[in-house]
């Protein structure tokens, strides 16, 4: 069963995310520092009548990287072509994208950390000199064909900035780290979306959904849709606090946005009694691959001070111990302390 607090997008979510996606700065909630800087850079580019410098967005999934790219295109009054690095398998794939863009257009590449080194090599001159170098043939008869490109803006998005090669990272003129959202920001997002879904949420219900959404709009919208289902079946015209609490409890999402997998991970670290635990050990104990633990389970727990990464492994923080003592979860873990 898929986790309700999964930060990656479910297959069926792509269409409704587009429906609920903000299309202007006025609608876009959160990431205020990034918005402020982007507004300046966009205005400067428009006054100079130049394409924006290349932009890199990085941070956990579901925080609005794709949405920002689309708003930038809208503000620049230009076209945007969207793809993902795994879709660009060979030089011809990249060439097809680059030769079909116009002056000032935006090319958005998601998961750019998954781009192969061979494709990166072709991308470098395109980003720096707006030139495409294509090798035709092989061996001694091989020839390099140079194709001039219109000036464009590449927007890259990644959840794993550390996996980007230095040469690729250095070719982006702007780097923006996406931050987790505050409960207040998420409550506004929930309220905004609930009106678009024609099922208004009471303010306290929006806050209840927001505080269980792990600082992530994608999760907040997913929970809202499921809470809306409970409200619909109960023949209610709006989402109430009582219905939101009931629905979220039924979905297995607790007051802090933790689900069963989070609790299992935290219990495991607490049981180690301050001894660091390696990623491979955690993976074996939870029957999860290391990538899932590192990219999906850990980010929110680390950002909120429940887990600490050390050179020797992961440990539970005092905040984590305190949560378990106060929450009444797995009291047996503390019996011999």
UniProtKB/Swiss-Prot annotation:
Its EC number is 3.6.4.-. DNA binds at residues 309, 314. Residues 1-181 are annotated as: Large ATPase domain (RuvB-L). Residues 182-252 are annotated as: Small ATPAse domain (RuvB-S). InterPro entries: AAA+_ATPase, AAA_lid_4, DNA_helicase_Holl-junc_RuvB, P-loop_NTPase, RuvB-like_N, RuvB_C, WH-like_DNA-bd_sf, WH_DNA-bd_sf. It holds the Pfam family RuvB_N. It is an enzyme of class 3 (hydrolase). It catalyses: ATP + H2O = ADP + phosphate + H(+). It is found in: Cytoplasm. GO terms for cellular component: cytoplasm; Holliday junction resolvase complex. GO terms for biological process: DNA recombination; DNA repair. Residues 255-337 are annotated as: Head domain (RuvB-H). Has 3 domains, the large (RuvB-L) and small ATPase (RuvB-S) domains and the C-terminal head (RuvB-H) domain. The head domain binds DNA, while the ATPase domains jointly bind ATP, ADP or are empty depending on the state of the subunit in the translocation cycle. During a single DNA translocation step the structure of each domain remains the same, but their relative positions change. Gene3D superfamilies: 1.10.8.60, P-loop containing nucleotide triphosphate hydrolases (3.40.50.300), Winged helix-like DNA-binding domain superfamily/Winged helix DNA-binding domain (1.10.10.10). Homohexamer. Forms an RuvA(8)-RuvB(12)-Holliday junction (HJ) complex. HJ DNA is sandwiched between 2 RuvA tetramers; dsDNA enters through RuvA and exits via RuvB. An RuvB hexamer assembles on each DNA strand where it exits the tetramer. Each RuvB hexamer is contacted by two RuvA subunits (via domain III) on 2 adjacent RuvB subunits; this complex drives branch migration. In the full resolvosome a probable DNA-RuvA(4)-RuvB(12)-RuvC(2) complex forms which resolves the HJ. Belongs to the RuvB family. The RuvA-RuvB-RuvC complex processes Holliday junction (HJ) DNA during genetic recombination and DNA repair, while the RuvA-RuvB complex plays an important role in the rescue of blocked DNA replication forks via replication fork reversal (RFR). RuvA specifically binds to HJ cruciform DNA, conferring on it an open structure. The RuvB hexamer acts as an ATP-dependent pump, pulling dsDNA into and through the RuvAB complex. RuvB forms 2 homohexamers on either side of HJ DNA bound by 1 or 2 RuvA tetramers; 4 subunits per hexamer contact DNA at a time. Its main location: cytoplasm. Mg(2+) binds at residue 66. It comes from Sulfurovum sp. (strain NBC37-1). GO terms for molecular function: ATP binding; ATP hydrolysis activity; four-way junction DNA binding; four-way junction helicase activity. This is Holliday junction branch migration complex subunit RuvB. NCBIfam families: PRK00080.1 (NF000868), ruvB (TIGR00635).
